[in-house]
Amino acid sequence: MDEHYETPPGTVTIAPGVLTTIVRMATLAHPGVLRLAPRVPPSLPRLRGKGAQAEGLRVDVLEDETVTVDVHVIADPNASLTDLGKVVQTQIARALEHIAGVQVRSVNVFIDEIEFDASV
């Protein structure tokens, strides 16, 4: 279930958990994202059974070796939510392409909640 790349003189294997770590880091790098949502996205059938799921996110490697991402976040109420979603999509795609060398088919950002400071 790992991502394999043939390179002379051997193979480079990227575990699905590495992809979730990259997605988590790219998502949390945006100042408008307070944290990942505590829920896990519902399980959907995978085309090849490849991918990984972690708290608030899911990464699937499709049959054509492209990647799809679903990430659920809790946002800062002062953030522009539309801009936050677009920037997080771009950050995730760039990080996966640059760090892991995978082609990204889609990144879906779900803003599940905004969190206000309790002292306000």
Protein language model annotation of sequence segments:
Residues 1-81, 86, 102-120:
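Contiguous, often N-terminal, cationic amphipathic patches that form binding interfaces
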